[in-house]
């Protein structure tokens, strides 16, 4: 009985910490606005790229975004409901048949383009 109370308590805390985020899935191009504290300054950094994977559920859910900068692939993993994420915008929707797009890492930048939904 006490475990049931504990589970309900965990679920209520999880529901309280969830943020409203737009629907997106692997293959979509998203723009993530991240709050950064640099000493006494606060600024917002934009990271735009292709969503490679999305995993977890509720508060522990994360997603990985990949972009090419100066010929080098950069991947960052963000918690979906993190307070440092100011905003997540979906730039375009992609058409893919996989849930995890790890194969994109081995493709050239031209070959890694994803078809867009119209």
UniProtKB/Swiss-Prot annotation:
Q: Which Pfam families match?
A: Ribosomal_L19
What does the entry give for GO biological process? Answer: translation
Q: What Gene3D superfamilies does the annotation carry?
A: 2.30.30.790
Which of UniProt's keywords are assigned here? Ribonucleoprotein, Ribosomal protein
Query: What GO terms fall under cellular component here?
Result: cytosolic large ribosomal subunit
In terms of domain of life, where is this protein from?
Bacteria
Q: Which GO terms describe its molecular function?
A: structural constituent of ribosome
The record's annotation in NCBIfam families points to: rplS_bact (TIGR01024)
Q: Which HAMAP family match?
A: Ribosomal_bL19
Question: According to its UniProt entry, what is the function of this protein?
Answer: This protein is located at the 30S-50S ribosomal subunit interface and may play a role in the structure and function of the aminoacyl-tRNA binding site.
Q: Which family does it belong to?
A: Belongs to the bacterial ribosomal protein bL19 family.
Give the protein's recorded name. Large ribosomal subunit protein bL19
Organism equals Aster yellows witches'-broom phytoplasma (strain AYWB)
